[in-house]
């Protein structure tokens, strides 16, 4: 029986590279591409099937920044599948990133220069906005949309006799200092991306605490700095090209520069092949590349505690309850309006 793997954000960047690597290693998989843009998804699906004709590749349309879309996709997936073996929670955004030139300049002459380039700490701020669901866009896209997807797909994921995996695309930029339980949507801050990635780390830990006994396991991985649409939002492609000689030199000292999406998937692919129950839920798995271009995996203990993770999980459950009530009221009003016409 084919393993079924669902990948959000599968039409480009890390998600697309992940599809290619997984099928290159096992073309008997059933990959389900969860994408917002159907035309891109269909092109990717056709290309994957052309190169791996024995594989099974399907598409489901989902926009994790729109909860109605998440609910529709979840309903469709439950009609299609009996179980899901793995979900890669990979889709994410970093809107309107602004490079802090002053911090970059001073960082170049500090002892933390390698750390700065590895984590982008203090280098980036982002804009954010409110979605149609009334939530902060980065939080909804990177965290809450995926949380609702997991909640909706629990019947396909929880099988104690044969464990399922959740694998999050996290980041080295996830920092405790940018996250607050009182403002977990980061509506008052300027680093929503870092906050959202710390939130996914917390959520992963809480999911293990609440679902391991039901056969569901969660882990987080960081792809490093790979050149994708996300990094091209920070600097245009031609600037990255100009910087490449310096970056290649820097890679001898900072292994976070994976540079290509293929390299960036190293830890994500490795996790898929492990027994999830054997992995430490408090560890983040990092894709790394040496100065000579060899890929390997590093581990990093996450800077968090399980009590905070559980408190955050409970806040998400409360928000979910509120959202469901709001959606139900909206649907009821729409039905009443329709019956009056």
Curated annotation (Swiss-Prot):
Top enzyme category: oxidoreductase
Pathway: Steroid biosynthesis; estrogen biosynthesis; Steroid biosynthesis; zymosterol biosynthesis; zymosterol from lanosterol: step 5/6
GO CC, any one term: mitochondrion
UniProt topology in membrane: Single-pass membrane protein
Species of the source: Homo sapiens (Human)
InterPro entries: 3KSR/17beta-HSD (IPR052834), HSD17B7/Erg27 (IPR042829), NAD(P)-bd_dom_sf (IPR036291), SDR_fam (IPR002347)
GO MF annotations in UniProt: 3-beta-hydroxysteroid 3-dehydrogenase (NADP+) activity; 5-alpha-androstane-3-beta,17-beta-diol dehydrogenase (NADP+) activity; estradiol 17-beta-dehydrogenase [NAD(P)+] activity
Keywords: Endoplasmic reticulum, Glycoprotein, Lipid biosynthesis, Lipid metabolism, Membrane, NAD, NADP, Oxidoreductase, Steroid biosynthesis, Transmembrane, Transmembrane helix
Domain of life: Eukaryota
Subunit structure, as described in the record: Binds to the short form of prolactin receptor.
Glycosylation positions in this chain: 37, 178, 229
Binding site for NAD(+): 8-15
CDD domains on file: 3KS_SDR_c
Protein name (Swiss-Prot/TrEMBL): 3-keto-steroid reductase/17-beta-hydroxysteroid dehydrogenase 7
Tissue specificity annotation: Highly expressed in adrenal gland, liver, lung and thymus. Expressed in breast, ovaries, pituitary gland, pregnant uterus, prostate, kidney, lymph node, small intestine, spinal cord and trachea. Weakly expressed in all other tissues tested.
Description of activity control: Estradiol 17-beta-dehydrogenase and dihydrotestosterone oxidoreductase activities are selectively inhibited by 4-methyl-4-aza-5alpha-androstane derivatives, such as 17beta-[(N-Heptyl)methylamino]-4-aza-5r-androstan-3-one and 17beta-(N-Decylformamido)-4-aza-5r-androstan-3-one.
Post-translational modification: Phosphorylated.
Residues annotated as transmembrane: 230-250
Swiss-Prot/TrEMBL catalytic activity: 17beta-estradiol + NADP(+) = estrone + NADPH + H(+); a 3beta-hydroxysteroid + NADP(+) = a 3-oxosteroid + NADPH + H(+); 3-dehydro-4alpha-methylzymosterol + NADPH + H(+) = 4alpha-methylzymosterol + NADP(+); zymosterone + NADPH + H(+) = zymosterol + NADP(+)
Matching Pfam families: adh_short (PF00106)
Catalytic residues identified in the record: 193 (proton acceptor)
Entry EC number(s): 1.1.1.270, 1.1.1.210, 1.1.1.62
Extracellular side: 1-229
Residue spans, topological domain Cytoplasmic: 251-341
Underlying gene: HSD17B7
Entry's family note: Belongs to the short-chain dehydrogenases/reductases (SDR) family. ERG27 subfamily.
Residues bound to substrate: 171
GO biological process: androgen metabolic process; brain development; cell differentiation; cholesterol biosynthetic process; embryonic organ development; embryonic skeletal system development; estrogen biosynthetic process
């Amino acid at each position: 029986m084919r393993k079924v793997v669902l990948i959000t954000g599968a039409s480009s960047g890390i998600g697309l590279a992940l599809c290619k690597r997984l099928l290159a290693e096992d073309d008997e998989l059933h990959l389900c591409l969860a994408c917002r843009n159907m035309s891109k998804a269909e092109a990717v699906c056709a290309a994957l099937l052309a190169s791996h004709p024995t594989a099974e590749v399907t598409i489901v349309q989902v926009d994790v920044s729109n909860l109605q879309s998440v609910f529709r996709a979840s309903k469709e997936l439950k009609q299609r599948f009996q179980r899901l073996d793995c979900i890669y929670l990979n889709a994410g955004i970093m809107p309107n990133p602004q490079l802090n030139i002053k911090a970059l300049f001073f960082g170049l002459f500090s002892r933390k220069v390698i750390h700065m380039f590895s984590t982008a700490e203090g280098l980036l701020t982002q804009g954010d906005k409110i979605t149609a669901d009334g939530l902060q866009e980065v939080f909804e896209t990177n965290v809450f949309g995926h949380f609702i997807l997991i909640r909706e797909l629990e019947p396909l994921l929880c099988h104690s006799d044969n464990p399922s995996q959740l694998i999050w695309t996290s980041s080295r930029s996830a920092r405790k200092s940018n996250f607050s339980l009182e403002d977990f949507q980061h509506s008052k801050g300027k680093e929503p991306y870092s906050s959202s990635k710390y939130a996914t780390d917390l959520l992963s830990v809480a999911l293990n605490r609440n679902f391991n006994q039901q056969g569901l396991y969660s882990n987080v991985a960081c792809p490093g700095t790979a050149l994708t649409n996300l990094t091209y939002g920070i600097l245009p492609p031609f600037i990255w090209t100009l910087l490449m000689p310096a970056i290649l030199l820097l890679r001898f000292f900072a292994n976070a520069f994976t540079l290509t999406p293929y390299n960036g998937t190293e830890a994500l692919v490795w996790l898929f092949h492990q027994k999830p129950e054997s992995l430490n839920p408090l560890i983040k798995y990092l894709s790394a590349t040496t100065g000579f271009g060899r890929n390997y995996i590093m581990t990093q203990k996450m800077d968090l505690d399980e009590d905070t993770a559980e408190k955050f999980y409970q806040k998400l459950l409360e928000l979910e309850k509120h959202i469901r009530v709001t959606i139900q009221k909206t649907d009821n009003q729409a039905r009443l309006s329709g019956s009056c016409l």
